[in-house]
Protein backbone atom coordinates (compact mmCIF):
# COMPACT_ATOMS: atom_id res chain seq x y z
CA UNK A 1 0.00 0.00 0.00
CA UNK A 2 1.45 3.34 -1.00
CA UNK A 3 1.98 6.13 1.50
CA UNK A 4 -0.42 8.59 -0.14
CA UNK A 5 -3.42 10.29 1.44
CA UNK A 6 -6.59 9.51 -0.51
CA UNK A 7 -8.14 12.91 0.30
CA UNK A 8 -5.30 15.43 0.11
CA UNK A 9 -2.80 13.52 -2.04
CA UNK A 10 0.01 14.11 0.47
CA UNK A 11 3.09 11.96 -0.30
CA UNK A 12 6.47 11.41 1.32
CA UNK A 13 8.96 14.16 0.64
CA UNK A 14 12.75 14.05 0.85
CA UNK A 15 15.13 16.23 2.79
CA UNK A 16 18.23 16.06 4.93
CA UNK A 17 19.09 14.99 8.44
CA UNK A 18 21.40 17.59 9.94
CA UNK A 19 23.83 16.66 12.68
CA UNK A 20 25.34 19.09 15.15
CA UNK A 21 28.42 19.21 12.88
CA UNK A 22 26.14 20.14 9.91
CA UNK A 23 26.70 16.80 8.18
CA UNK A 24 23.78 15.96 5.92
CA UNK A 25 22.30 12.58 5.05
CA UNK A 26 19.19 12.06 2.96
CA UNK A 27 15.95 11.15 4.70
CA UNK A 28 12.23 10.91 3.98
CA UNK A 29 9.50 12.92 5.69
CA UNK A 30 6.42 10.69 5.80
CA UNK A 31 2.84 11.98 5.99
CA UNK A 32 0.89 11.14 9.15
CA UNK A 33 -1.40 8.53 7.58
CA UNK A 34 -4.16 6.69 9.40
CA UNK A 35 -6.42 3.88 8.27
CA UNK A 36 -9.83 5.18 9.29
CA UNK A 37 -13.35 3.78 8.91
CA UNK A 38 -16.10 6.25 8.11
CA UNK A 39 -19.83 5.49 8.24
CA UNK A 40 -21.68 6.26 5.00
CA UNK A 41 -25.26 6.89 6.07
CA UNK A 42 -26.73 6.84 2.55
CA UNK A 43 -25.22 3.40 1.79
CA UNK A 44 -25.56 2.03 5.36
CA UNK A 45 -21.97 0.77 5.40
CA UNK A 46 -18.46 1.67 6.50
CA UNK A 47 -15.76 2.79 4.05
CA UNK A 48 -12.12 2.49 5.00
CA UNK A 49 -9.81 5.23 3.78
CA UNK A 50 -6.10 5.81 4.19
CA UNK A 51 -6.04 9.49 5.10
CA UNK A 52 -3.67 11.97 6.67
CA UNK A 53 -4.72 13.76 9.83
CA UNK A 54 -5.36 16.87 7.74
CA UNK A 55 -7.56 14.73 5.49
CA UNK A 56 -9.59 13.68 8.54
CA UNK A 57 -10.11 17.35 9.40
CA UNK A 58 -11.24 18.07 5.83
CA UNK A 59 -13.73 15.18 6.07
CA UNK A 60 -15.01 16.60 9.38
CA UNK A 61 -15.50 19.97 7.68
CA UNK A 62 -17.03 18.94 4.33
CA UNK A 63 -18.66 15.64 5.24
CA UNK A 64 -17.81 12.09 4.19
CA UNK A 65 -20.53 11.97 1.51
CA UNK A 66 -18.99 14.92 -0.36
CA UNK A 67 -15.48 13.45 -0.14
CA UNK A 68 -16.59 10.00 -1.34
CA UNK A 69 -18.36 11.65 -4.28
CA UNK A 70 -15.13 13.52 -5.17
CA UNK A 71 -13.07 10.31 -4.88
CA UNK A 72 -15.45 8.42 -7.18
CA UNK A 73 -15.34 11.28 -9.69
CA UNK A 74 -11.53 10.90 -9.72
CA UNK A 75 -11.93 7.20 -10.46
CA UNK A 76 -10.84 5.84 -7.08
CA UNK A 77 -12.62 2.74 -5.84
CA UNK A 78 -14.32 3.39 -2.49
Curated annotation (Swiss-Prot):
GO cellular component: cytosolic large ribosomal subunit
InterPro entries, sorted: Ribosomal_bL28 (IPR026569), Ribosomal_bL28/bL31-like_sf (IPR034704), Ribosomal_bL28_bact-type (IPR001383), Ribosomal_bL28_sf (IPR037147)
Keyword Ribonucleoprotein: yes
Pfam family, one: Ribosomal_L28
A single BP term in Gene Ontology: translation
Residue numbers spanned by region Disordered: 1-23
Record key words, sorted: Ribonucleoprotein, Ribosomal protein
NCBIfam families, per the entry: L28
Protein name: Large ribosomal subunit protein bL28
Species whose genome carries this gene: Shewanella frigidimarina (strain NCIMB 400)
Organismal lineage: Bacteria, Pseudomonadati, Pseudomonadota, Gammaproteobacteria, Alteromonadales
Amino acid sequence: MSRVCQVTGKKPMVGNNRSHAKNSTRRRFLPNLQNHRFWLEEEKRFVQLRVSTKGIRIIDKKGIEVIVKELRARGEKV
